[in-house]
Amino acid sequence: MLLLNQTLATTEKQTALQAAEKFVDELCISYSAKKGRGYARKRQKNLLATLQAYKPQNPKDAPVNCDKCGKPGNVKNDCPGSMRKPARPCPICGGDHWRVDCPQRCRSLGPKPVSQVSNRIDGPQGSCPWL
């Protein structure tokens, strides 16, 4: 995973440098018409050197550690160690998971049989009763 991140970071840097070089070339072409070719070439070299030496303060390819468990690869919101188990069983199937994660929840969203149709007016007839 780290190798993939490094490869992506290298590719992104190369793409950014190519785009910057193209921008500098276009800028120098338009500028050379005003000032002369020698000055434009010198300016182009200075801009390219500045762009290649640029290092961001917080690089994206640096490993990120979780604030809760301290392990690299996840962040606090996605930490698998912070997942709480539900206090009660699932009201739909009785399993040990949250209601929103129930595999039996709303298998078919088609119309309900007449015996299950409620007299509620706040939702469509074929909607899931557990939403």
Curated annotation (Swiss-Prot):
The source's domain of life comes to Eukaryota
- Enumerate the InterPro entries for this protein: Znf_CCHC, Znf_CCHC_sf
Query: Which molecular function terms from Gene Ontology are attached?
Result: nucleic acid binding; zinc ion binding
N-terminal signal peptide: none
Keywords, in A-Z order: Metal-binding, Zinc, Zinc-finger
Q: Zinc fingers (CCHC-type) at which residues? A: 64-81
Q: Which Gene3D superfamilies would you find in this protein's record?
A: Zinc finger, CCHC-type
Oxidoreductase as UniProt keyword = no
* Record protein name field: Putative uncharacterized protein COL25A1-DT
The scientific name of the source species is: Homo sapiens (Human)
Q: Which gene encodes it?
A: COL25A1-DT
